[in-house]
A protein has these predicted regions:
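A short glycine-rich, Lys/Arg-flanked "PGG" loop and its adjoining helix->strand segment in the class I
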Residues: 50-70
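Short alpha-helix
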Residues: 105-130
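Rossmann-like AdoMet/SAM-dependent catalytic core
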Residues: 129-224
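Catalytic activation segment of kinase domains across protein kinase-like and atypical kinase folds
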Residues: 91, 95-104, 328-396
Length: 521
């Protein structure tokens, strides 16, 4: 079926031959610059004979490579953080199956980073370069390296497509903890490994890639960070011909200065894409994150109000802001009679895109800048919403509603802005086609699980005794005992109670059991 899909996708290509069968039995008759092992290595034991099926398979793949060729392996990480956080093992759908060592399974294996490094080295590929696709190699939206793993927000929330994923803890928080310990590369969800028989020589070093392939064709772009000599550059390129004009227009946008002390980072258009030097300073989000840790709420407000007053200094009242161009981008949902608007307007003005530069600020990622009036409150609402999503601790200091109120944004505005955002995201820019298959993570309360389990192991009962006035709560003893060797044993001590005329024993637990009075003294 996969071969059929591949064929129908690429039937017009003249340089592609599709062969179906066991690759170990094929003789391709030549050597290649690249051999791609994508989602295959983990199954090597099921179609390769011998005591070392994985090494045997990789050596076979090496026989198809030129001496200067490269082997590309894409595979899940056995110790991926998603598995600890509650995702089932990808190949068996069993929670923690890989972490537990695939007990009783003889068809599939994945590997930790160390295991994969050693396996590939023993198979004849001593030169290796690791990349980390995120959320995983099957549907990547970003690709990280060791140089960008701790600096480019690896670990953001992402959609899931299985209804068997439980929510044991925040995967994002787990990854952040691993970053602080400098071991995040051991807990990434997937590996993309480039390996060679000889040293891997490149003219430039790729540090990071972001893919926007889920958008409409005219907005599909690829952004990558590249190190050349001693400088790091960002490049944004169209993923298809339809997006070429979109990318080309960014050079003009890069020359704009949205407000006093704020300017877009200049870029130049070359070789079909835009190029600009990567900034290394702190972002406004970094600054606010530090202020959150110090619980300096007042300084957070002053920082955001400074942005608002400077970037939107030229805002003016616009009763006719919902123009035809506006409705094309944000939809027909009616807004208020008027808003204070700015033009041109960058609706993606989030704190992570604003870098400190001395006393001033430089703005990156300004691709969603429009030349018609847009409410300043709408842009500010998007900035605030993004902050609270990316810095959860902020909500404990100052609620998002209160923050909105600081900028005159009421709940009715939020409903309008959300409708505009939904239209922009899903209708204008275009959303990922996989969105319709998204599933919710299943909430799990481990404390409740422990409590329920303990209750099954506990037995509650109450003994009433009558001293002449009948049975009553005042004359009762309640006790709880633990299951011991397959039975509950309950003892009531009544030696200090005189003139007992009768007793009654009540079960308080919903337990079916056989009752036996062992001693009555």
């Amino acid at each position: 079926r996969r071969a059929q899909i591949n064929y129908y996708r690429n039937e017009k290509k003249e340089n592609l031959t599709i062969m179906v069968g066991n690759l170990n039995d094929m003789d391709l008759g030549q050597q290649y610059d690249y051999v791609v092992v994508n989602g295959v290595l983990e199954y090597a034991m099921s179609f390769t004979e011998g005591d070392t099926p994985y090494e045997t398979f990789l050596r076979k793949m090496g026989s198809y490579l030129k001496d200067t060729g490269k082997l590309l392996i894409a595979i899940e990480n056995k110790l991926g953080m998603k598995y600890f956080a509650g995702a089932p093992e990808d190949h068996t759908d069993i929670p923690f199956f890989g972490i537990n060592g695939y007990p009783g399974n003889h068809s599939v294996r994945t590997f930790s980073k160390t295991e994969l490094q050693e396996l590939v080295k023993e198979s004849g590929f001593p030169f290796q370069k690791f990349y980390y696709p995120y959320p995983d190699y099957k549907f990547p939206t970003e690709i990280f390296t060791d140089a960008s793993l701790t600096t480019n927000h690896y670990g953001k929330n992402y959609p899931i497509y299985t209804d068997k994923t439980v929510d044991l803890f925040s995967e994002t928080a787990g990854i952040e903890a691993m970053k602080k310990e400098q071991i995040a590369d051991r807990f990434v969800n997937s590996f993309l490994l480039v390996a060679g028989k000889q040293e891997l020589k490149e003219k430039e070093e790729l540090l990071y890639v972001k893919l926007n392939q889920g958008r409409r064709k005219e907005f599909r772009t690829l952004t990558q960070l590249v190190r050349r000599d001693d400088s790091v550059w960002a490049e944004k390129k169209p993923l298809c011909p339809e997006a070429e004009s979109f990318v080309a227009g960014l050079e003009k946008t890069g020359a704009q200065k949205p407000g006093k002390g704020f300017r877009n980072l200049p870029c130049r258009y070359e070789n079909g894409g835009i190029v600009y030097q990567v900034l290394s300073g702190k972002t406004l989000e970094d600054r606010i994150c530090d202020l959150v840790e110090k619980e300096q709420t007042g300084e957070i407000l002053r920082t955001l109000k400074h942005v608002y007053e400077q970037v939107f200094a030229q805002r003016k009242r616009e009763p006719e802001y919902q123009t035809e161009a506006f409705r094309e981008v944000f939809g027909e949902h009616p807004g208020k009679d008027y808003y204070e608007c700015v033009s041109p307007a960058n609706i993606d003005l989030i704190c992570a895109n604003i870098f400190e530069s001395g006393e001033d600020y430089e703005i990156i990622d300004y691709e969603w800048t429009f030349d018609f009036p847009i409410p300043a409150a709408f842009i500010m609402w998007r900035m605030i919403h993004e902050l609270y999503c990316r810095i959860p601790k902020l909500g404990a200091l100052y609620t998002q509603d209160d923050m909105n109120h600081e900028f005159g944004i009421e709940s009715s505005d939020c409903e309008i802005f959300l409708a505009w955002t939904m239209h922009f995201t899903y209708e204008y820019a275009g959303s990922d086609s996989l969105d319709i298959y998204r599933k919710d993570r299943i909430p799990v309360d481990l404390s409740e699980t422990v409590r329920t389990y303990r209750e099954k192991k506990q037995f509650r009962s109450k003994l009433y005794y009558d001293t002449g006035a009948g049975l009553s709560e005042e004359n009762s003893i309640e006790t709880t005992v633990e299951l011991n060797r397959g039975r509950f044993q309950v003892t009531f001590d009544l030696h200090n109670v005189e003139n007992i005329r009768g007793i009654r024993w009540n079960l308080l637990s919903d337990t079916f059991c056989e009752v036996k009075v062992e001693v009555l003294d």
